[in-house]
Amino acid sequence: KHSLPDLPYDYGALEPHINAQIMQLHHSKHHAAYVNNLNVTEEKYQEALAKGDVTAQIALQPALKFNGGGHINHSIFWTNLSPNGGGEPKGELLEAIKRDFGSFDKFKEKLTATSVGVQGSGWGWLGFNKERGHLQIAACPNQDPLQGTTGLIPLLGIDVWEHAYYLQYKNVRPDYLKAIWNVINWENVTERYMACKK
């Protein structure tokens, strides 16, 4: 069974950039719901497999993708953030960003624009294309997980569902994007990058 991961910091730790009320609801209610619904869906899926009921298996696919994706995405998201975050990455990750996007500022602009431009709910991602050995920016709708839908390995995800920012930034998604760069945990993103290069 899947369980809700603990946050590596307090709900109020990312203030003033993301307030405690948002973090508490986002983690203890939204992410928890994905975990619970994923467990229920997997149980039903196992039953359908045991019965050889292919129709039921197919009918459960959207719930599996939505709740499984929600759990995968948020588990990455919490570690991508830190009260000691912000600034720029160092070392190999920074070199790769410069190589693939021209400069850190251009990368930031591109990921911001991609995330702001998501229609409705979804995510903006920095991913690693293992075949090409390059970094890539992508957007995924709803809770579609990056790797499961594009093959890119997720390094940095920006949640642009309204529940991630509305209580603080209302409908002004660009202000939320501007703020989130102050709490990006580049150490975590770098660890993910180094791991997929092995």
UniProtKB/Swiss-Prot annotation:
Cofactor(s), by name: Mn(2+)
Gene Ontology MF annotations: manganese ion binding; superoxide dismutase activity
Enzyme class: oxidoreductase
GO cellular component: mitochondrial matrix
Record GO biological process: cellular response to oxidative stress; regulation of transcription by RNA polymerase II; superoxide metabolic process
Post-translational modification: Nitrated under oxidative stress. Nitration coupled with oxidation inhibits the catalytic activity.
Free-text cofactor note: Binds 1 Mn(2+) ion per subunit.
Binding site for Mn(2+): H26, H74, D159, H163
Compartments it resides in: Mitochondrion matrix
Modification sites for N6-acetyllysine: K44, K51, K90, K98, K106, K178
This enzyme's EC code(s): 1.15.1.1
Matches recorded under InterPro entries: Fe/Mn_Superoxide_Dismutase, Mn/Fe_SOD, Mn/Fe_SOD_BS, Mn/Fe_SOD_C, Mn/Fe_SOD_N, Mn/Fe_SOD_N_sf, SOD_C_sf
Paired cysteines (S-S): none
Source domain of life: Eukaryota
Signal sequence annotation: none
List of residues that carry N6-succinyllysine: K44, K51, K98, K106
Family listed: Belongs to the iron/manganese superoxide dismutase family.
Function: Destroys superoxide anion radicals which are normally produced within the cells and which are toxic to biological systems.
Subunit structure: Homotetramer.
Protein name per its UniProtKB record: Superoxide dismutase [Mn], mitochondrial
Protein species of origin: Hylobates lar (Lar gibbon)
